[in-house]
């Protein structure tokens, strides 16, 4: 039984990275590994976020790593050092975690998630308003391309390990992608 929970936890971690999930079958705005999501569909902001916070200004991030220099902008390749926090600032995932809940993910790029009853697949429907920096819509094929890149030959083995339980990704239509699990 402990192994089952451990495996479910790691699959959930993949989900928050935009990769995978395990649960009963229904489409919902969020997925909770334990219990029900705290926030309802369409919630405006997390409770710990101040929507009236001042906007604008300058953000300075200081890396706590020994090295603060970089020689590449692709954080996924093996060779070189990427700037600190680059992945967090440039890339979005299908789901985003909540800081006031344990193991719960809410749709970020995904409008909803539907998990198969057998736990062997999860389908994500992308938000129509999900866009790249140039205004082009994020499509299911883009999500599949991201997965294929992360498990490809030029990517750090850490991503292949993280995604080892994912058998593959299928594009169901322009806005729907399905992750299949081993």
Identify the meaning behind each predicted range.
Residues 125, 160-182:
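Surface-exposed binding/hinge segments that line
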Residues 27-118, 148, 155:
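N-terminal lobe/hinge region of extracytoplasmic solute-binding protein
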Residues 15-16, 25:
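Cleavable N-terminal signal peptides
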């Amino acid at each position: 039984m402990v192994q089952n929970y451990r495996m479910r936890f790691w699959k959930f971690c993949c989900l928050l990275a935009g990769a995978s999930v395990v649960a009963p079958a229904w489409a919902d705005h969020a997925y909770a590994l334990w219990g029900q999501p705290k926030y309802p569909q369409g919630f405006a902001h997390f409770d710990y976020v101040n929507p009236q916070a001042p906007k604008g200004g300058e953000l300075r991030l200081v890396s706590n790593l020994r090295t603060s220099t970089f020689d590449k902008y692709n954080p996924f390749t093996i060779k070189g050092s990427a700037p600190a926090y680059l992945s967090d600032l440039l890339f979005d995932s299908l789901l985003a975690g909540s800081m006031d809940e344990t193991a719960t993910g809410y749709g970020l790029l995904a409008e909803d998630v539907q998990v198969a009853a057998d736990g062997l697949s999860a389908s994500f429907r992308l938000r129509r308003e999900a866009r790249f920096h140039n205004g082009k819509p994020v499509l299911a094929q883009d999500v599949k391309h991201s997965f294929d890149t992360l498990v490809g030959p030029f990517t750090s083995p850490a991503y292949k390990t993280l995604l080892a339980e994912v058998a593959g990704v299928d594009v169901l239509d322009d806005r729907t992608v399905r992750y299949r699990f081993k």
